[in-house]
Amino acid sequence: YFGMEHKGRCVGNRINAYTSDMDFHGGSKLSKLTYPIKTIYSKEARVQLRKVLDDFQPDVCHLNNFNYQLTPSMILEIVKWCKETNHQCKIIFTAHDYQLVCPNHMLNNPNTHQNCEKCLGGHFVNCMKGKCIHGSTAKSAIGMMEAEFWKWKGTYKYIDTMICCSEFMKSKMDSNPLFATKTVAMHNFIDKVEWKETEKKDYVLYFGRFSEEKGIGTLIKVCKELQDVQFIFAGTG
C-alpha cells in the first residue's frame, strides 16, 4: 500500500513511505499558499512512491483516488521506474467518481443543483465558468488547471485498464477517446452471506450515500407523489 499518511490509515508498506497529510481545512497560512500547486503536482509523492517501487518491485500498480493529494504525478514515476529498471508493470485504475472527466468529480453543478456534463470531452474551462467547485471561482480555476495540465501531459495514456463501478460510469468515461478502449464495468464487491427466505414485501429501496448528485432530491419528490408506495432509504450522508 502507498498513500497519504493520516490517522485513519490501517494498511501500510514495509519501509513506511507515505506522503504528508494534507489538511485543506487547517494548517498554517504558508502551507495553504502551497496547496494549489501541490494539488496539481506532487514531487513528494514521486519520491516516496519510488522508495516503495524499489522495495516491492510490483508487477501491477492498482491506483485509487489519486487526484489532489497524491496527484497523477505518481503515474509518471511508475512509468519512469519501469523504464529505468526494465521492469514491466501494468497500471490499473479504479474510478470511484468522475474526476478524470469532470473537475468537481460529480457531474453535477452544486450551484444550480442540476446534473451537468459540460466538461465531458475535455472542455474543462466550463468548471471555472460554472464555479463548480464549492461555488468558488478560485477553487474552480485550480480544478480546471489540474485537469488541463494532465490532459496536456497525456499522462492518463499510461493507464492500462480503468475499472468503473457501473455501466453508467463506463459510458461517461468512454466520452474520452483515450479511455474508451481501456474501461471495464465491474461492480463493487460485497461479502457473501447465506441467503434466507423472507416474507415478500412490495417497496422501493434506495441503498447508498445520501448526496445530492445521486438524485436523492428527485427521489424524495417522487415519495411525495406516490404516497401509497413504501420507500426505504438505507445509507448515510
Residue ranges and their predicted role:
Residues 163, 196-214, 219-226, 232:
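Conserved donor-binding/catalytic core segment of Leloir-type glycosyltransferases
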Residues 5, 168, 189:
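Carbohydrate-associated surface elements
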Residues 1-43, 47-56, 237:
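N-terminal strand-loop element at the rim of the active site
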Residues 92, 157-167:
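A short beta-strand/loop micro-motif in the catalytic core of glycosyltransferases
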Residues 51-70, 89-94:
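Short N-terminal targeting/anchoring amphipathic segment
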Residues 189, 207-211, 237:
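Short donor-sugar binding/catalytic loops of nucleotide-sugar-dependent glycosyltransferases
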Residues 174-175, 180-202:
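Acidic anion/phosphate-binding donor-loop and adjacent secondary structure
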Residues 99, 111-161:
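Membrane-proximal helix-turn-helix segments that form the acceptor-binding/catalytic region
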